[in-house]
A protein has these predicted regions:
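Short helix-coil boundary/hinge micro-motifs
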Residues: 2-15, 19, 75
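C-terminal structural segments of small proteins and small subunits
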Residues: 55-76
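Residue-level signal for pocket-adjacent positions within structured domains
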Residues: 13, 50-52, 69
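Generic secondary-structure boundary/loop-capping signal
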Residues: 15-16, 34, 71
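A short, structured beta-strand/loop element
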Residues: 21-60
Length: 76
């Protein structure tokens, strides 16, 4: 069972390195940031609200998301 929950304030995930796309540019814009938790889970937050809620995914969930994105499952 995870010690993290969805909607946890990102400020409670102290000491993490948050990553975002290099394509986001210097102003940040509407970017998603991710961080890898010591438990192996992956946290995601909105760069415009870095202290706001974070979504937490298991590694298999994250891998499935990346696979779907790479396969075009989310394309319009």
């Amino acid at each position: 069972m995870s010690m993290y929950r969805n909607g946890i304030p990102a400020t409670e995930l102290a000491g993490l390195t948050w990553l975002k796309s290099q394509r986001s540019g210097p102003t940040g814009g509407n970017c998603v940031e991710v961080a890898f938790l010591p438990s192996g889970e992956v946290a995601m937050r909105n760069s415009r609200d870095p202290g706001g809620p974070a979504l937490v995914f298991t590694r298999p969930e994250w891998d499935a998301f990346l696979g779907g994105a790479g396969d075009g499952e989310f394309s319009c």
